[in-house]
A protein has these predicted regions:
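Residues lining hydrophobic/aromatic ligand-binding pockets adjacent to catalytic sites
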Residues: 1-256
């Protein structure tokens, strides 16, 4: 039976309450400001032993220094700002990725998510850079699953999918916007749900039962061993809880 793990991107309620409701969370603070090892170890200790953290990678790896979210960082990374972001194969990016992995390991996290912005250049240089980034980062990865959520025009480039396959990087998608993503040799499906609408995100959207039943059907149809269904909208708490209820009612999937 296919296994489905349901959770939220970030904590919509106090951590202690969240631990009693779900078995997984995708940490968001790791994206905005990479936390200390001490913080990560403390959060790991406070969580139940069977609780899982997934980590959204530090923004400096994926977003250029001109990104608005950079301005909110209290501690800017060392080195040349121009060498950060867009998965460039620079020593700065590789170092930031290594630091992200160190934090993720302190959390006991198995999955690390890279999310690049829609402004990422849609050209051959980007493809070469990404290929080199994953090649250079390969030696740093131990047992982690690396996922990449690609946004913008770059999604249409066929060469990109060869890079994913070459480096066994899972393609992270919103299933309401893209189907049959590359799931890696581990056949892992990771979907981040940003709300339904004409754009790439609609965080204010409230998923209806009809939407959630459609999501259930998509999960029945998709080929995978394990799926992570991570809600990333304003009403993610209620939507995630309701989706889990629907899966239990319909059966056919192992729900966590």
């Amino acid at each position: 039976m296919k296994r489905v793990v349901v959770g939220c991107c970030g904590f919509p309620v106090a951590r202690g309450k969240y631990y009693s409701l779900f078995k997984v969370v995708e940490l968001q603070n790791t994206f905005y400001e990479l936390p200390s090892i001490e913080w990560a170890e403390g959060v790991r200790r406070e969580a139940p032993g069977d609780f899982e953290f997934t980590v959204k990678a530090w923004q400096v790896i994926t977003h250029p220094h001109t990104s608005p979210t950079w301005k909110k960082m209290k501690r800017k990374p060392s080195g040349s700002p121009e060498n950060y972001g867009y998965l460039k194969p620079s020593k700065e990016n590789i170092s930031a990725f290594e630091k992200t992995l160190t934090v993720s390991r302190a959390l006991g996290a198995r999955i690390v998510i890279l999310q690049t912005p829609s402004s990422m250049p849609d050209n051959e240089e980007t493809i070469k850079n990404v290929d080199s980034f994953f090649e250079n980062a390969k030696s740093l990865v131990k047992n982690e699953v690396i996922g990449w959520e690609i946004r913008g025009p770059l999604l249409s480039r066929g060469e990109l999918y060869r890079v994913l396959e070459k480096h066994n990087v899972v393609q992270v998608v919103d299933l309401f916007r893209a189907r049959n993503p590359f799931k890696g040799s581990m056949k892992l499906l990771y979907t981040r749900l940003h709300g339904i609408g004409p754009g790439e995100v609609n965080y204010s959207y409230n998923y209806t039962d009809e939407d959630l039943e459609k999501l259930y059907n998509m999960l029945v149809e998709e080929d995978y061993v394990e799926a992570y269904v991570m809600f990333n909208n304003v009403r993610m708490l209620n939507n995630a809880l309701r989706f889990r209820e629907i899966v239990v009612e319909k059966g056919g999937l192992e729900i966590v």
